[in-house]
């Protein structure tokens, strides 16, 4: 079962989505829970990591850990100059956001089947794992180990998610869709990055739950995600029986 969820229609509320994902308010906090937190911390007000109505300030030198990758060996020993190569080249050429774009393309689930796999192989050969970017004849080098990675996936330009439950119902797989653009060459592409784990889905659902409750209205997206949540692996009710496992 595969579900595509796109947040293009949420552009007008994107600031709230950014903020909610980053601080404790995205969780579905009941009044009793908030009261307990205040009693525990002896605080009169909740202290948020970020203002609820403001998005984080994007920084080009901070990269989502979603784009972190381990260089792998590619079997390609040559690069074919074809349409795919040229499209990717134009996407990178003089791109103001070249580093993020390059890492996104390498991490793309399709990169192992094209010339970017060769590029990844070449990177593995460098002893210091150096990345180079060039724009307007000005080149910069980056040490891969010294790049600033953050757990926040929304520092990248995410436009959608794909959720997939396999037939065996023991794994949860999802893909995160990132929109890449180069205004210099007027080229665009959507890359698909595989993500294993249910944490992003939970955070996303809790974010929408809060938004729905805060503004006191429901919408089809959250209804579909709630239905989807019910059939996810390990979401059945806990048993009251003690079962021996040996």
UniProtKB/Swiss-Prot annotation:
Q: Which superkingdom heads the taxonomic lineage of this protein's source?
A: Viruses
> Which Pfam families does UniProt cross-reference here?
Cytomega_gL
- The keyword Membrane is annotated on this UniProt entry: yes
How this chain sits in the membrane, per its record, is: Peripheral membrane protein
What's a GO biological-process term for it?
symbiont entry into host cell
Predominant location? virion
The GO cellular component terms are:
host cell Golgi apparatus; host cell plasma membrane; membrane; viral envelope; virion membrane
**Keywords, A to Z?**
Disulfide bond, Fusion of virus membrane with host cell membrane, Fusion of virus membrane with host membrane, Glycoprotein, Host cell membrane, Host Golgi apparatus, Host membrane, Membrane, Signal, Viral envelope protein, Viral penetration into host cytoplasm, Virion, Virus entry into host cell
Localization terms from the record: Virion membrane; Host cell membrane; Host Golgi apparatus, Host trans-Golgi network
Question: Is RNA-binding included in the keywords of this UniProt record?
Answer: no
InterPro entries per the UniProt record, alphabetical: Cytomegalo_gL
Q: Which residues form the gL betaherpesvirus-type domain?
A: 29-235
The protein's matches in PROSITE patterns, at most eight in alphabetical order, are given as: GL_BHV
Range of residues in the leader sequence: 1-19
Q: What does the function comment of this entry state? A: The heterodimer glycoprotein H-glycoprotein L is required for the fusion of viral and plasma membranes leading to virus entry into the host cell. Acts as a functional inhibitor of gH and maintains gH in an inhibited form. Upon binding to host integrins, gL dissociates from gH leading to activation of the viral fusion glycoproteins gB and gH.
The entry's family comment says: Belongs to the herpesviridae glycoprotein L (gL) family. Betaherpesvirinae gL subfamily.
How does it associate, per the subunit comment?
Interacts with glycoprotein H (gH); this interaction is necessary for the correct processing and cell surface expression of gH.
Query: What HAMAP family does the database record attribute to this sequence?
Result: HSV_GL_betahv (MF_04036)
- Put simply, this protein is called Envelope glycoprotein L
* Species annotation: Human herpesvirus 7 (strain JI)
Gene encoding it? gL
